[in-house]
Regions:
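Structural recognition of alpha->loop->beta junctions
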Residues: 107-120, 184-198, 204
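Canonical Radical SAM [4Fe-4S] cluster-binding loop centered on the CxxxCxxC motif
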Residues: 1-7, 47
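Radical SAM enzyme [4Fe-4S]-AdoMet core and its adjacent flexible, acidic
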Residues: 40-69, 135-136, 141-142, 188, ...
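Radical SAM enzyme core and accessory elements
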Residues: 204-300
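Conserved SAM/AdoMet-binding glycine-rich loop
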Residues: 14-165, 169-173
């Protein structure tokens, strides 16, 4: 995979603008790591990625270049091409990288929200449990919470009403029922439940699959919890969509097994109603057109 120069992208935008039938909208520039597109440091430019460390985990590498100016200038150049009406970033951004930019991060967020979000912005926190995020090799949840706050503040200041669409995954190696419950409580607190639940699926050649296969973290060879059986995977997946009537019995089972019966009942601090089998007050009929505060499509 190779990055493209600004000149190459602008040249293609000009070709698109002259293409018959083109409506003036470019729907994505940069892919899912759009703002983290340049080599991370001088060492990566010469010899590729480091074999013994990651750029952002467990702490940002001191050699890491954090700068959004080149990407921001590229977006400005593309949207200034005659015939281009809108340039969107729809695959998502690396929010943890953005939050490290103390000099230009706010300017980037301003232009991102004002010019490049069509109403919803996809991001991939993947989980909120720091234990699971550590297994994933990702920044802790505090980075995502700071990003959420900045996104909300920027929207308010610019008079916009945009939504975050976070991607979460269940049953990743390292995740227990306690971690899945922590994620469910986060979803309830933020008012967002995903319409689709993504379960971990092992794929060859990945660190996570090595964990899944061996039950060990290859980085330190310590045991790591793994949800292998279909039952536990179903329980964790149900907690991602805790408010669906069809998941009620699984959510109750998960809470009781984890010793969290305190979350069963009615009220703001509860996860699932103790009402009848039809679902109680925690379960509502789906209404697809009314957005949730954080961008879901099912109101609470």
């Amino acid at each position: 995979m190779r990055g493209r120069t600004r000149e190459s992208l602008v040249r293609e935008a000009r070709v698109l603008a002259r293409t018959e039938g083109f409506k003036g909208y470019i729907h994505d520039v940069g892919g899912p790591t759009a703002n983290f597109r340049a080599p991370a440091c001088a060492l990566q430019e010469k010899g590729g990625a480091c074999a013994d460390r990651e750029c952002l985990h467990p702490e940002p590498c001191p050699r890491l270049r954090v700068d959004h100016r080149e990407y921001l200038d590229t977006l400005r150049a593309i949207r200034s091409v005659p015939g281009i009406k809108k340039v969107f970033i729809r695959s998502g951004i690396r929010f943890d990288y953005l939050m490290l930019d103390e000099t230009g991060g706010r300017d980037f967020m301003d232009e991102l929200c004002e010019f490049h979000v069509s109403g919803q912005l996809k991001v991939a926190p993947e989980h909120v449990s720091d234990r699971v995020l550590e297994a994933m090799g990702k920044s802790g949840n505090a980075a995502y919470e700071r990003f959420r706050g900045l996104f909300k503040e920027t929207n308010g200041r610019l008079g916009l009403k945009q939504y975050l669409i976070p991607y979460f995954i269940s049953s990743h190696p390292g995740s227990t029922l306690d971690d899945a419950i922590e994620l469910a409580l986060h979803l309830k607190r933020t008012g967002f439940v995903p319409d689709q639940a993504q379960d971990f699926y092992p794929t060859p050649g990945t660190l996570a699959t090595a964990m899944y296969r061996t039950g060990l973290d290859p980085r330190d060879m310590k045991p790591i919890p793994v949800a292998r059986g279909e039952r536990e995977k179903r329980l964790q997946r149900a907690l991602l969509q805790y408010d669906r009537p069809e998941n009620r019995s699984l959510v109750l089972e998960a809470l009781r097994e984890a010793g969290r019966a305190d979350l069963i009942g009615d009220g703001p601090g509860k996860l699932v109603s103790s009402g009848n089998a039809e679902g109680g007050r925690n379960f509502r009929v789906r209404q697809k057109k009314e957005p949730r505060p954080e961008g879901g499509s099912r109101p609470r």
